[in-house]
Amino acid sequence: MKIRALFIVPILVVGLVSCSSDDSASDSSVATGDSVAGTEAPVSEAPTTTVFAPTPVAISGVGETTVEGPVTGGGGQIIFGTATFDGSGFGYTEEEYFISGTANSYTSDQPLTEDGMWNVTPKDTADYKTRILVRRPTTAADFSGTVYVEWLNVTAGLDTGPTWSLSWVEMLRQGSVWVGVSTQRVGVEGGGNKMGEFRVLKIADPERYGTLNHPGDNYSYDIFSQAGATVWQQSDAILGGLVPTTVIGMGESQSAFRMTSYLNAVAPTHDVYSGYLVHSRGMRGANLYCATNCADPGDPSDVKGPEVALIRTDLQRPVLNFSAETDVVGTNLGYRKAEQPDTDFFRGWEVTGTAHGDAYSLGIGDSDTGSGNGDQGLFDAQFGAPSSVYMGIIECGLPINAGPHTYILRSAIHSLDRWV
């Protein structure tokens, strides 16, 4: 089984937040001669973190799914993901499945508020059929019990798994399972960024994916709930008989915006996931419901995400909000406006010296085999950060950030797994 980077379109989307700036307040590059240790914050007394005894999820109001697979035929497994390695060498198996069901969309009688305390109700339903990609230990004895379910990112016009790409080394060390979910319409049907459209599932491989059907992003929140419930309830079918004890939902960048709205709108009642990683979000919340892509400002049925959205404080599941420095202080994402205090169920990690996209995620990680070569490549970049990557397709003019994003994210995933 080969897990490989298929092409480089997604890097163009994040390239602008990867280059260093002349403004020292927002410059997150690692200067020549700096080390990873040089990015660490001064030691201070941290708040006590509650470690919870595992509490079974309730899975309330979530529709049942039908599972097909493992899927064969065609080329398959169209997803951009860092790392070229033979999974069998790590004792891992990669399989793909289709899940289908009937999903709800959601609406709210009131505008969605900054505090995240949203009250939503189901609006309408639609049938769907999408795909999930599973990377799991081949042998049950090697399984940690934890499953990470990633809301695949479609900013580049196709499915990508950026959190997997930056943290797969830690997941494999744990012996955990990763499940990537084609949650949004663009990854299945197209219609997004034109750069990636030729790798959309149904366009790139109609033989394999032609029967898929995604009714639109209004239904994505319920699809993500149903995918998580499938991991719990049909593990024999999709995990090769592995039995999960913890299922963590995660999403990065654009998917983190949607994870924010998922947490505020759907998570409290569905209670599917044991905990959540919100990775590199901005200040906004994603739209909850759009009649026509929220293009008509006068459409009363639209329920748009607020300009600033905190994560609601009454959640009873741990949430780790992970932010690179450019997520917080950069002009593109502006998470600083949505910062909120830590609580028993919320932790915010803001990682100095890191960028939304960096030298590891934009190239070095593509050749990381887990043998240490990726580490050496990143350490070398810290002493001489590149100003261009991918044969000059991204040209920054200034050094591309070579900070420790991947390492701190791996630590975050390890800590979240212990926390829940």
Functional labels for PLM-detected ranges:
Residues 29-51, 55:
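Extracellular mucin-like PTS domains
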Residues 15-18:
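C-terminal motif of bacterial Sec signal peptides marking the signal peptidase cleavage site
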